[in-house]
Amino acid sequence: MRQSFDETQTPNENFDWFSQWYPVMPVCELDKRVPHAKKILGIDVVVWWDRNESAWKVFDDTCPHRLAPLSQGRIDQWGRLQCVYHGWCFNGSGHCKFIPQAPPDGPPVHTFKKACVGVYPSTVQNEIVWFWPSTDPKYTDIVKKKKPPFIPELDDPSSTNSFMNRDFPYGYEVLVENLMDPAHVPYAHYGIMQLDQPPKAKVDREGGKPLEVSVKKLDTNGFVGRQEWGNVKFTAPCTFCMYNDPVDVQGNGSASFTRTDKTICGQNFREQPSTVFFFFCIPVSPGNSRLIWGFNKNVESWIEKIILQWLFHMKLNLLVDSDLYLLHIEERKIMEVGAANWQKACFVPTRLDALVVGFRRWLNKYAGCQFNWGGKFNGTDLPPTQPKEQVQVPCSKLQKLHFCIQGSHCT
């Protein structure tokens, strides 16, 4: 069955992976008292709260002295980031403010350029810390020219945002296409996620059925899609949202409901309770990715928020565990045939494959077929295949599994 795509004609426009904003972590999962280590795009960064500027900072996770990780350091009594190895201290601009070993009557070596730490532009939007992956000073004010994709519903004060994040032993491309694939749900997640409306003519135990799925307005910035139960929007490279109502495609990667009844901070929202599911897919390194995901929902009381969040936490982790090993192996098979040959190697004849095909078409047409690691890695060099029992670690044993409600912190 032929799948149609409404593509914007931009034949000479290529997607620049390193000229984009990338999500780091939800604010509610960050402790202001300590620095935090993260790897994004193969870059080791440290995230910390600069109380002097009242802002989250993202630095290169390397002390210029002996290359020790600053994420293992501490925030000193003056609010500076201190390297725990030799005590060097840095302010929010990356300037070294104190070297304990330097004599006070000697040359001010702490002011030398080589004593500075690389600083990445960062901002907070939709209660998430974002960073721009370049320490070049020319990007210091990049947020004034280009902002991260904005989801207005996440700034609606009458609703609750619930966040989770988790690292996965498979890459960015497989992570994105799996989220876009509704056809696998009754099979890969059988017994965990039930269909709301079972098919009238049930052909198997799981209850799979044909569905109308389509992709529209595919260009270098991503695409929007339509499913029977609602709409989706992929804003390259990281943001994938599911909406109950038609998507209003706006500038700067924004998307919101088209049927609206109230206005908050210049943005429109429906009066009736509604839900937006959001997913931020983050390349970590070849064969590894991170997902920040959650939902926005109108709830009445704090106890409803806690219960809803806990149920969401438990159910979603069962879901992602159930196809974890399958995707770990699938990625290696894709690499064997080559990412550029995905369309030839995979037989995707039904409309239910439209979003996955749309994502792969976007990759092939605009983004070099797969994530570009900027020379840091060869994208085809994946880590060794792990045994199933190592990949599918029970939720109770996970160290990097977090969830939170906007304005609170839980693990």
What are these regions (language model features)?
Residues 9-15, 24-153, 411:
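Rieske [2Fe-2S] iron-sulfur-binding domain
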